[in-house]
């Protein structure tokens, strides 16, 4: 089994995190932390499943981490936040209806840009697998040896 970490979404999202919670979760399988090449996967929670509403239940109880252990996959769990003001998001949903902008469903959408930047900060460049190493509450990329 691996380890669960938090990362600062605002710091790693390239300024596109206004509708996101401060922290995201990252699950790192033991094999990935010990140097085996690993891939990355993004798991988006549903409405009312953001961390402020359910703690880490979505992250720890869906079975995704067991699948990640078996397949050498680092899992990024980005987190939204509830908002009762504009942009209105009272159930902490990902933007699937346009509450952030009309670009919500394409790569120019703010949430897509934020998650893409987070993944780049953890993951790889050019599609090549890398090793992942956890260092405190930050994720540090270490190159293949």
Describe the residue ranges of each PLM region:
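Short beta-strand element of the alpha/beta-hydrolase
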Residues: 26, 36-48
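Loop/turn elements at helix/coil->beta-strand transitions in domains of secreted/extracellular proteins
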Residues: 35-40, 70-76
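Catalytic phosphate/metal-binding cores of nucleic-acid and nucleotide-processing enzymes, i.e., regions
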Residues: 17-24, 59-62, 73
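Hydrophobic/aromatic beta-strand patches that form the interior of the parallel beta-sheet core
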Residues: 5, 42, 76-78
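Long, low-complexity intrinsically disordered regions of secretory-pathway proteins
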Residues: 137-145
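Cap/lid segment of the alpha/beta-hydrolase catalytic domain
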Residues: 49-57, 69, 76-125
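Surface-exposed acidic, glycine-flexible loop patches that form ligand/cofactor-binding
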Residues: 27-36, 64-68, 124-131
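N-terminal cap/lid segment of alpha/beta-hydrolase-fold proteins
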Residues: 1-35, 107
């Amino acid at each position: 089994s691996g380890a669960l970490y938090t990362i600062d979404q605002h710091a790693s999202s390239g300024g596109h995190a206004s509708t996101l919670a401060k922290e995201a979760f990252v699950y790192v399988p033991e094999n990935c932390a010990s140097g085996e090449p690993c891939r990355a996967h993004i798991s988006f929670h549903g409405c009312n499943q953001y961390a402020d509403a359910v703690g880490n239940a979505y992250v720890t109880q869906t079975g995704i981490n067991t699948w990640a252990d078996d397949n050498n996959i680092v899992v990024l769990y980005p987190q939204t936040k509830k908002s009762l003001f504009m942009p209105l998001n009272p159930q902490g949903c990902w933007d699937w209806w346009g509450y952030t902008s009309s670009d919500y469903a394409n790569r120019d959408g703010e949430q897509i840009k934020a998650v893409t930047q987070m993944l780049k900060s953890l993951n790889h460049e050019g599609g090549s697998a890398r090793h992942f190493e956890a260092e405190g509450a930050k994720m540090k990329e270490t190159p293949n040896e």
